[in-house]
Each structure stands twice: as structure tokens, then as C-alpha cells.
Amino acid sequence: MLEKNPASTAPAADGSAQPSAATPDATTDPHLVAPGSADSAVARGERPTVDAIATITEYLDRSDWRVNANANQGYSLGGMMLNTSGKVVANYWLSQVYPAVAGQAHRDADLHIHDLDMFAGYCAGWSLKDLLQQGFNGVPGAIAAGPAKHFSSAVGQIVNFLGTLQNEWAGAQAFSSFDTYMAPFVRLDDMTYAQVKQCMQELIFNLNVPSRWGTQTPFTNLTFDWTCPADLADEHPLIGDEVCDFAYGDLQAEMDLINRAFMEVMTEGDAEGRVFTFPIPTYNITRDFDWDAPNTELLFTMTAKYGLPYFQNFINSELDPGMIRSMCCRLQLDLRELLKRGNGLFGSAEQTGSVGVVTINMARLGYLYADDEAALTARLDELLEIGRDTLELKRTVIQHHIDAGLFPFTKRYLGTLDNHFSTLGVNGMNEMVRNFTHDAYDLTDPRGHAMCVRLLDHVRDKMVEFQEATGHLYNLEATPAEGTTYRFAKEDRKRYPGILQAGTESNPYYTNSSQVPVGYTDDPFEAQEMQEELQTKYTGGTVLHLYMNERISSAAACKELVRRSLTAFRTPYITITPTFSICPVHGYLVGEHLTCDKCAELHPEAEPVECEVWTRVMGYFRPVRSFNIGKKGEYAERQMFTEVAAGGHGPAVSRLSAVSA
């Protein structure tokens, strides 16, 4: 195991050096620090420090780019409190828990240890079935609610559960099979459609309130089955401690009401026409998906306008939808096998998720080891092993504190991290190829593409080694890297002025994971042909966002785009991501509008009325003005996909099979 030593300066929440002044307390537990702690800063009486004055001032005047690192966290008192406490927590992780080599690798931006500002695990998928059957209770000193007996009380418990558990985790909280598990309440309460829709409004509005630490909205994901899964079809629901005289498979009409109500509320948006950022809905598209069902029109009307859903590909997939619920059983399989999670990036499989994430700066490796793939791979292995060590330590620390009661609701509803993955990811593979080849070609060239495939396969092999060595689950994720992509580029520019990057001098960034350059094509099928093989290499979550220049013209056109994509390609996850704008007077506007043309026509003498331009920052929609510096640079360079280009593509042909659509 690697030895840990003190750092001379204190890191901020992202680990970069900060001035010194105030001293946070750090006590040593010999079970929770790396071997070698006798040589640590604490043991020698040296303690990491944070400059309290500078920390508050940088936030108040927004001079620190990290104020906008996360587009879900607005400038606010809560944001200031989280930013301030985050620096203290990051100091604890880097100087008290992790070995010195890991802390230095993070500070130097060789890799990025995510969520250092939060003393918590990454993301978690929960069992909605357990919550509904057991109620929201079991924590000493906290209000206890028994199993819900009605739809409205179930909605209340779901909101309370997700909001509460979000405060014990850094990332997304998810429920799967939402429509299946909620359908019995509709029948038992003999609900009308209007009543179901009212409950859906309460659910959605309440899940979009900034109630999370840092004045953030809880990051939530709901997976919808659409039709009852075979493994639940004959099971009789247990509602209010009583077994129902019907099975889940008898409730398709009730499931349809729930799906219809959810989609109508999401499509309507809020009172000013804004999109609901959460919950992110995921739909499992299977081979028997009914593309002509009445609700399908609503699904693609919603998608064409706001682009909200994630579509999980079970048409060309190694997974069965039932694995989303049975994943906790599947995880007992041979650790020599790399397991695919039933989710994109948000832990949507039941009772599993991710303990933590470490992302490797691939662009730097391409620059430092140009023309020498063997040396690049050797250094990649070193960084992956550092990542492994940090994730093993984090697992030990968080599990210890779950047992000790620091995370009371996680202890009640999860208990163990045994079924949670340790996640490693990559960033900037396109720039890696460019630097490795002195800009002779990039990832879109067959040679660059092949290099990326080789390296991703190599990382997968390392995951198997790590699983066998540790007994813990590992996976490879196309990490969202919302702030990391800019941080890597910013740090590399300081250290290596000649390194090739995307963006501009003031807005540099690296292309996410192994994605094609954002300006590569306006044809979504060309992008998928290029991305398919790379996308299938990820075992811990990946998604291909089809960024459209504007609202898709019709539900039928949107449906055809999704159908062709999922039928032709093995890409695990896709989204349709239209660009739209919100005028404070006229609401939703199609496409990008910095100012409102309608307002200008009505009042030509008045000052232009500014609009919010919305698109997906990574996994979720936010106004472009809330993006961090790097993401603004990416948005400026992005060539949006168009319906015209998609329509002129011809048959979409997979490189991995003879399938076409």
C-alpha cells in the first residue's frame, strides 16, 4: 500500500492549493487512514489549513471558478456554506485519509478524485418496493411513518425519502420500476386520472425544490417499466401490511395512468414554461416495446420538446430489464466477470450504486507519452492503481461511519456497501489521441478509434484484476466530469503550454470520456456509428446525448429517431437533447434565443428582453449561463445535430453487427 505524507498547502474542494490561515481539527483513527500514518502531518503536529477570509471572499465576489463548477448549485447562502465546508472536508480526505501519492496526483491533476468536498458515497439506487412495504422509519429520534396505504401518502414518503437520503450521498438517488410499484395504489384508491395527475404534480414540484445541502435540488432518477416486467407479473403487492388479491401484472391500465400523468406534467413545465430538471426519467425500451401505444405519443411529445428521458437500450443489450431489480442478487456472481450495471450514470439499479469515482486525465497521458503507447499504458496503470487505493480507503471509511451511525437512513435502508461499485473513469481521450500523434489525427480517425478501444479494453482488464484482488466490485464509467473537464484543461495549460486542448484560451476543456469532438458532425447517426463500439466498453454507465439544435418537429419524428438509434446500434443509453429558450414573458421558445423576438416585435422601442437558453450540461438540463467556464466553451463549439442531417443519412448501420435501421 502507498504511504501518505503531509501536503504543504491545503486543497480547495477540488484539491487545488489554497492559502493558509484557519485550522480544522483532524483526529486519527488507525483503521481509517493509509498505512504510514505515523509519518502523517497530524502525527508530527502539522495540520492542513484553510484561509477562512479568502474562502468567503472568493465565493462572495465569485472570483473562484468553482462557484459555478456545478450548474445545479446556484449562488446562494447555502452554496457559500457548502463551498466553505467543502474545503475543510477535502483537506480531511487528502491529508488525513488518502496516501500522499494520491493527494499529489489529484492536486497535480493527473487524476481527479470526485466529491472530495462531501464526506459521503457517490450514488445509490434504492428499493421502492422496500420503502412502500416498510414505510419511512427506523431511525432513532426521527419521525416514523408506517407503510403507505394510499397513493398520496406514498408520494409524500418518496419525496421525503429521496430528499433525506440525498443528504447522506454526494450524487444521484434513484428508484426503479416506479410505475409498476405505484400502480396498486391507483386501483385500491379507485383514483380518477385527475387525482393521479394531481399527485404527480405534487411529486414533481416537490422534487424540484432546492432542499439539498448547498441550496441544490436533489439529484433524482426514476425508471419506468412502461409494461409490467415478467419477474413481477405474478407477484401480489403488499400494501399497508395486507396482500392484495391482484398481481402487478393485472395493473397495466393503472400503470398507463401513472405514465400519462407524469409525462403530461413534465411536458407542461412549470408556471413559466421551464423544464423540470428532476426527476430524470429513464425508460426501458425492449424488443416488444409498443411504439404505437397511446402513451407513446405523449412520451415522444415530451422528448421532442424538452428531451427529458433517458432511453435504456434493451433491444441491443446484454441486460434484461429484470436485472435492474435483481442486481443485488446478480452481484454475487464471479468476481472475474465484469458486471454491467442496469443504469446509465445515476445508480438506478436497486440496492447498488457507487462508493466513489476517480477519473484519469487521458489528455495529459497522450501529451507526456507521445508516440509511446507502452509507456502511456504503464503510467495509466499506475494512476488506476492509485485510484483503486483511494476507492478502497473511501469504502472502508464510509462503511465504518455507516456502522457508527453518521448516515442513519443509509444504515437503515442499505446497511452495507458490499453491493456498491468502486468506479474509475476516463476523460479527454480525443485530446489524448491528438497529443499522442502530434495532431496528425484524432479519435474519429480509424487509428485513433482503435487506440481508444485498446485502452478501454485494457482498463476493463484492470478492473477484473482489482475485483479479484480486493473482493469488491469495480466498473468503468464515462464519468460526467462536469467540472473536472475544465479543471484538467486549466491545470494542464499551466504546466504544459504546448498541450493540445479543445475550447479557447479563456474557456479550455477536454472532450468528455471517449466522445467524438463536439463539432464533429450535425448527423446523429454518423455520431452513433462512430461512438457505438466505444460506448459499449463502459460497464459502469455511459450515455450518448443527441444534442439537437431545436425542438424536434413532431412526436413521430422524435420516435423514429429513437427507434432507429436503439434498433441499429448497441449504444446502451441515449437521450434526445433539444436546445430551447425561456422568455420571462412568453415562456418556452424553440431553439437558442439570447433575446426574445416576440417581445421585440411587440415593443420595438424597449430594451431587448433576455432569455434563458437551456440544454443539458451533462446528465441534466440547466441554463447555459449557469455552466462553468469549460462547459461554456464546450457549448460555444458544439455543432448541434439536426433533423435534416438525420433524415438524409440513409440506413443507420452498426459497425458491430449487420443490423441496420
Where does each model-flagged region fall?
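Mature N-terminal, pre-catalytic/accessory segment of carbohydrate-active enzymes
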Residues: 1-28, 37
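Charged, amphipathic alpha-helical regulatory modules used
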Residues: 2-6, 416, 636-639
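Non-catalytic alpha-helical coupling and interface elements of nucleotide-dependent molecular machines
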Residues: 3-10, 392, 619, 623
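Conserved catalytic cores of very large enzyme subunits
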Residues: 29-418, 439, 445-604, 613
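Extended amphipathic alpha-helical segments enriched in small hydrophobics
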Residues: 420, 424-433
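Intrinsic, low-complexity terminal and presequence regions
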Residues: 581-661
